[in-house]
Regions:
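Acidic/histidine-rich, metal-coordinating catalytic segments
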Residues: 1, 73-87, 112
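Extended, low-complexity cationic-aromatic segments
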Residues: 1-67, 167, 175
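Short catalytic/ligand-binding loop motif for oxyanion handling, primarily in non-cytosolic enzymes
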Residues: 5-8, 86-88, 110-113, 163
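RNase H-like polynucleotidyl transferase catalytic core
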Residues: 20-28, 96-113
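RNase H-like two-metal-ion nuclease catalytic core shared by retroviral integrases
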Residues: 80-82, 102-126
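Short, aromatic/basic amphipathic alpha-helical patches
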Residues: 88-98
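C-terminal anion-handling pockets and recognition modules
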Residues: 114-180
Length: 180
């Protein structure tokens, strides 16, 4: 899942010297945020949905999985990150009924393939216009259709075929001495 702003624009732009770069609009849509949920594989996006209000909780995730994943896929490995809504027993039971569930290692951006996908998706969305929920859905569909399959394979290779192994770093936080 990821948060997507209706005005997904770059933070830097060019303007005349001494003039501020401004995007003018009368629409209140620029302040809206949506929650997107995506299921990806090495062959592309399996399914996705965009919610207008609220984040992804266990009930929404179950609804998405039932509608788009567990009803269509069998004997697949479903990888979820460590969000609390993903670790719910109801989620585990639903996925393990016909598939296998695996949780990603504790958060490391380079081992989480979906985060790399979100970065690619959002950078491409920044180049498109459209403020409304409907237009944003069209833009997402457009961006998804233009991402080559090779990119999806590279995302997974980068996350799961890393030459170096994850090594936990020593903690740098110093223990405060208790003088009193």
């Amino acid at each position: 899942e990821t948060s997507i702003k209706s005005l997904q624009k770059r933070h830097h732009c060019y303007s005349e010297k001494g003039k501020r770069c401004v995007i003018k609009t009368q629409s209140q849509e620029v302040f809206k945020k949506y929650t997107g949920i995506f299921a990806i594989s090495v062959d592309g996006v399996i399914e996705w949905d965009l919610y207008e209000k609220g984040g992804i909780n266990t009930d929404r995730l179950i609804e998405f999985l039932k509608k788009n994943i567990t009803s269509k896929l069998r004997n697949k490995l479903i990888i979820l990150d460590n969000a609390s809504s993903h670790r719910n027993e109801r989620i585990k039971e639903l996925v393990n009924k016909h598939n296998n569930i695996l949780y990603a290692v504790p958060y490391q951006h380079f081992t989480n393939s979906i985060e790399n996908y979100f970065s690619m998706l959002k950078s491409r969305l920044q180049k498109l216009d459209g403020l409304t929920h409907i237009k944003l859905k069209e833009n997402i569909e457009n961006v998804i259709s233009k991402i080559p399959k090779e990119k999806y394979r590279n995302i997974f290779k980068g996350a799961y075929e890393r030459p170096e192994k994850y090594v936990a770093k020593n903690k740098t936080r110093k223990i405060k001495k208790n003088y009193l």
